[in-house]
Amino acid sequence: MQENMKEYFSEKEARERRLATYTEKIQETVLNKSAETIRSLVDERYNQKMTQQEISDITGIKPSNLARFESGGRVPTLIVLEKYANALGKHIEIKICDD
């Protein structure tokens, strides 16, 4: 019985480590993709000579929140990204790709 418990806890710890590694990988991917999208939106905002305040007025997103995610201090939701893109006459497109 004790051997089964040791095996159970050993397998449980291994699963938890695999899950933690997987979660970290996914979080890193999401952060990188979000950063790329935000950079594209900010570049487009500059190209259109729009200020954060103008984006805020159109979208209702507080300028402080815009500043936070433009600087990488916060990861915006997909809804916030779409609002921002829409204010620039653009939209967000999501694709499913192979690894």
List each model region and its residues:
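Recognition helix of helix-turn-helix/homeodomain-like DNA-binding domains
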Residues: 59-75
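Short, charged recognition helix plus adjacent turn
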Residues: 95-99
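Charged, alpha-helix-enriched surfaces in structured cytosolic catalytic cores
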Residues: 36, 76-79
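DNA major-groove recognition helix of helix-turn-helix/homeodomain DNA-binding modules
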Residues: 79-94
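Short basic helix-loop element that most often maps to the first helix and adjoining turn
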Residues: 2-6, 10, 39-56, 83
